[in-house]
Amino acid sequence: MARRRRAEVRPLQPDLVYQDVLVSAMINKIMRDGKKNLASRIFYGACRLVQERTGQEPLKVFKQAFDNVKPRVEVRSRRVGGSTYQVPVEPTERRKQSLALRWMLSAVEGRPERTAIERLAGEMMDAAQGRGGAIKKKDDVERMAEANRAYAHYRW
């Protein structure tokens, strides 16, 4: 495996409605079995719902929610001697983005609303206000990092 090259990161195309790369990433994350049309209908439907319920710009709400969910620190396992330590590290910007999108989607799946559009809209509005499942996940990860701050010197 050591002879393989690192996969190059291909730039994402901005979405057609908001001309935003982050929206494209979210749509791609929502997509299952290559059904991008369905994924974009879900996302844009949720944006419409956010617009109706809050009267705010949906892209602004989404970005606010995304920024609130992005983790500042995370823990990574590091084996030293015979024991494994949870070492707090700051994730790269790319990893922060992928974790935030992943956590938002897993929180959406656990919500009680009927349709995917309503669940996504609800999670976006909640996360923008600093509550909801995705924010709870972020807080748990950051709390874990804070608890293991003593092992920060094992950073690599």
Swiss-Prot record:
SUPFAM superfamilies: Ribosomal protein S7. GO terms for molecular function: rRNA binding; structural constituent of ribosome; tRNA binding. Transmembrane segments: none annotated. It comes from the Bacteria. GO terms for biological process: translation. Pfam families: Ribosomal_S7. One of its GO terms (cellular component) is small ribosomal subunit. Keywords: Ribonucleoprotein, Ribosomal protein, RNA-binding, rRNA-binding, tRNA-binding. Part of the 30S ribosomal subunit. Contacts proteins S9 and S11. Belongs to the universal ribosomal protein uS7 family. One of the primary rRNA binding proteins, it binds directly to 16S rRNA where it nucleates assembly of the head domain of the 30S subunit. Is located at the subunit interface close to the decoding center, probably blocks exit of the E-site tRNA. This is Small ribosomal subunit protein uS7. The gene is rpsG.
